[in-house]
């Protein structure tokens, strides 16, 4: 038996060890550096040893506010060494007033003196501007990353301004009259194609009753100036002649590629108008999108490698929301790993990877988007992104991936993957029972449970980016519908896919094993019979 003194000694030792750990953690917190150690797109260091010129300071701040905003530390060297703010710049209120007076329109920032390693530094917090900011002497800057990952300020040229304003939803470039274009640059054959699309793709049928001029005006394909009609950017994109688009809108290019390993099987670049390009790319896809059949009752249902609806919506989104001021092409690439659709211009202001499926629909080119909706090519609710995710989820495949998106382009990747037939049947049966498609949040949660197997509400909310309250409401409905099973109570409560799904998978696996065993038994019997016959001889 252990003596009481020994037990007390152990307790004291345990407490001492824990006390040392706590003290160590506290020391780490107390000595933790508040100022970052290196510069990024949103972090800038400025030396103030020689009293930084005010024009240079304002110029740096203009570049940051015209990009993503961020924090500027005055009194820190480029390598992160803290050298301190000059006495002339130690007044935060004076710094804020200086920046407001030296920017057009006036920029409001927050400044304060902070102390790091016993040295004072001026910290300036810079918001991302909702418009273009210039210095008072007319200098417009933006911020970018160099190849080595370090940031720099560069001029924002006049041709870049429309793209920036479009990304901030302050300008609709697609609604502008295209300089140099005339009505002769519109192709009558493309207008016929437009009418056919409206007729056969559930477009706005009232448009078919209009004359050509009325149709052009209704879709804002043309604008009147001084009594003369001129094509807009949208008009040229939809109805323009290919050679004139190449000349007047050289940014409106598209590429379709098929790559097998390092071999290029197809590489087609075009400047055709969008309606012709959509149809051409859809035809190309049919040749490179094999199908697998699934038994569903008495029927055999084809399952494509890539969902047709998801591909179509991804294509429409790429052309509809791209930045037409940037000289880059929309790229569709079918590779061994999957399908990639990339388009110039990052997400517009307010859209990011976490809120893709929840943010209110708004695009970079509202007039073009509206025309595509009324024609019948784009999702009328503006929720085409839901269709892209639905196209993968209903077949039990990995979710579409936007993680490679940057500030300069949006990149959608849809992975090649075998369909989960049991999961697909479960979704199909439920949708047949309801007489409608399942909501996107229900599909996201079912997909999360399919891949993760077992999750709590908090984990579901984190994986799907759905708020906990909404996630709980959706999950409980899925439990009531028999698609999800719940176990445990309160915080320990977790959820899995309905056992029916797993039972069906196990049954199929068992049937396969039994069939293989029967084949092996027959083979063994025949082999034994032949062996006996040979032995008799």
List the predicted regions and their residue ranges.
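Short, cationic-aromatic polyanion-contact patches
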Residues: 489-510
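Conserved N-terminal catalytic/coupling substructures associated with nucleotide/phosphate chemistry
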Residues: 10, 14-306, 312-426, 447, ...
